[in-house]
Structure formats: C-alpha cells, structure tokens
Amino acid sequence: MPEKLQVLGSRKGLTPGLQHYTTVTVADNSGAKEAVIIGIYGYKGVLRRIPFANIADLVMVSVRKGTPEVRKQKFKAVIVRQRMPFRRPDGTWIAFEDNAVVIVNPDGTPKGTEIRGPIAKEAAERWPKVASIATMVI
C-alpha cells in the first residue's frame, strides 16, 4: 500500500491562486497538454464557497487536450506555477507566466520524465520527486 500523501498544511493568509474549473497547462511529458482542475484535496471550506488551491497543492484534474491515451481521464496533479502573485516569507512577490501542473501517480511520483519550464521553490521543497525531474527551480 502506498504511503499517504501530504495534502495540505496551514492555509491561513494564502493567496487564492487557482479555483475549481481553472484551465491549466500540463508541464510534463506525460502526454497531456491541457487540463481542468475538478477537485482540491484536503480543502475544508465553507458551504457554497468556491475551493481554491495554491502552489504545491495536490489537485484532481481532468485532461481535456493531449494524446488519446490520457484524454478524458482524471489524474492527481501538483500545482507548480500560478499567475496570481504570491508572497514568500522573505517578503518577495513572485508570479509566473501561466498556471501549470505536473501529473503524479497515486504514490506521488511524477508520471512524466521531464518538466518543461520552471517550477516554484515551494513545490520543489514539498514534492522532492517532482523537483528531481525539474529543469529549473525558481
């Protein structure tokens, strides 16, 4: 049985970067090109409030564009880039050019073998297996 994935820590004061039904780019070479966020793991919100996710959060995505093997399927994914600016503990603000995810297996290992583009330092610290195939960490 795979070990339990770390889902969410403290969410106080976080910028709501991505929400339900946000279209995201898939940054790895798993065959998927574009996906839609359909669920956010570990989110405990208020009734009728739209759930949101941030960098390094685990989400459920539905692949909309890609190879026929992965299209119309659901996968777990880790958010590695978001366009909404967010603040780091040292006071710097950072924002990326696009919203991007990396598809992972149920045990947390990436499905692809390389990641196109940079990934956030927060995602690299929380998901070391994802960071091992990243080309650039910002």
Swiss-Prot record:
The keyword NAD does not apply. Disulfide bonds: none annotated. SUPFAM superfamilies: Ribosomal protein L14 (SSF50193). The keyword Ribonucleoprotein applies. One of its GO terms (molecular function) is large ribosomal subunit rRNA binding. GO terms for cellular component: cytosolic large ribosomal subunit. Transmembrane segments: none annotated. InterPro entries: Ribosomal_uL14, Ribosomal_uL14_arc, Ribosomal_uL14_CS, Ribosomal_uL14_sf. It holds the Pfam family Ribosomal_L14. Coiled coil: none annotated. GO terms for biological process: translation. Keywords: Ribonucleoprotein, Ribosomal protein, RNA-binding, rRNA-binding. Belongs to the universal ribosomal protein uL14 family. Part of the 50S ribosomal subunit. Forms a cluster with proteins L3 and L24e, part of which may contact the 16S rRNA in 2 intersubunit bridges. Binds to 23S rRNA. Forms part of two intersubunit bridges in the 70S ribosome. This is Large ribosomal subunit protein uL14. It comes from Sulfurisphaera tokodaii (strain DSM 16993 / JCM 10545 / NBRC 100140 / 7) (Sulfolobus tokodaii).
